[in-house]
């Protein structure tokens, strides 16, 4: 089991909505039934920008405008995991925001990750999501400059505490 993972996540904005994925398609998915932004794991040799652009294109069909793509922060998830050698799983998530893109949104049937939907910002906290997402979404909305956020979760997925630097 790889207990240290690098990922990206992008909040793609159109009008007053974010493009979200309802993770309902994969069987063994730690994001199962949650609504999350678009992104995924790094492939060998990728930079954070390479990864987020590839993941967004693969999952949505959209091409992000590089000049408007904002690298907003790094979120470190530390999750207790009894199957990990040291009892912890750590994910470094490179967080992006973008409101300028080209292309046509693919049909949700063609997205392997889940159901794509534009969600009004005002409804974001009403959907099933990770509690820590509220913290970094708030930082994005407040236009906080580049930040580092550490989120500590227990094995059941409950947020224990967090630290913003």
For every predicted segment, state its role.
Residues 144-153:
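Low-complexity, intrinsically disordered Gly/Pro/Thr-rich segments
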Residues 2, 10, 26-28, 86, ...:
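Short secondary-structure boundary/capping segments
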Residues 12-14, 22, 97-100:
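Residue-level signal for short segments within beta-strands and strand-turn junctions
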Residues 18-58, 153-165:
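Conserved Nudix-box catalytic region and its N-terminal flanking loop in Nudix hydrolases
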Residues 1-19, 41-43:
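Conserved N-terminal beta-strand and adjoining loop/helix that marks the start
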Residues 42-66, 77-135, 139-140, 161-165:
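Unchanged
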